[in-house]
Amino acid sequence: MIIDVQHASWRRDQTMIINDISWQVQSGEHWCLLGLNGSGKTTLLNMINGYIWPTTGSINVLGEQFGSVDLREHRKKIGWVSTSMQQRLHGHEKAEKIVLSGKFASIGIYDQIEEQDHAQALSIMKQLDAERLVGRTYDTLSQGERQRILIARALMASPELLILDEPCTGLDIFSRDQLLHRVQSIATQEHAPTLLYVTHHIEEIMPCFNKTLLIRDGAVFGAGDTEAMVESNQLSSFFDTAVEVRSEPGQRYSIRLV
């Protein structure tokens, strides 16, 4: 099992942010986490990464029970792309150095870099059409280029789990589509990591995401096969608004109010 969350809750002061969530992710599954802003999606991810601890309940990730594992070493098995990660990076750092730092799950490089590490970083950047960014500093990159570098960084340690927390935020429509197709490519390659993709836009749910978790008000509204979760009746109840969902086999979803 990749992730096993059992009755996890998390409270900030007197406010319940995550409320009694139980959720399992099996090997071979790729999940989309769908919910409106403030629904608790990112908080749940922070618990899965070990950055915050559940007030009650338990979390097991990649076979390790949190509370009995070296989290710094454990995070090397988890690739993470998020706005908060982007804000922690140093703008003067060169793109390839940021990618290399992913091997150590660190901000900056404090370990010995081998020639094979450089070769791997360049190979991953090429896979993501980012090799032309070598030598560029992070603060000179566009938002789309920054996201590609963050994904390359996340892949550097060959993670077993890749978490993409609203990676299309701030992207124009063309950059968004390019990024989504790269995500699809990553998910369908041999020995791909398990993907968790967080969004509140159903048109970002690529065909590779065979499972969907619906989160509302910090609780699980529904979880299961994407075709069952992302359909008109289910999402009308989820959003508390009448909507029509359309899709074709192997294509992305669209939604409209009715």
Task: Give, region by region, the residue ranges found by the protein language model.
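Conserved structural motif at the start of ABC-family nucleotide-binding domains
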Residues: 3, 17-20
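Helix-to-loop junction immediately C-terminal to a conserved catalytic motif
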Residues: 49
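Conserved ABC transporter NBD signature motif
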Residues: 57-67, 74
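Conserved ABC ATPase "signature" region
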Residues: 100, 115-133
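Conserved ABC ATPase signature
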Residues: 137-141
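Catalytic Walker B motif of ABC-type/P-loop ATPase nucleotide-binding domains
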Residues: 162-166
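H-loop (His-switch) and adjacent beta-strand-loop-beta switch element
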Residues: 212-225
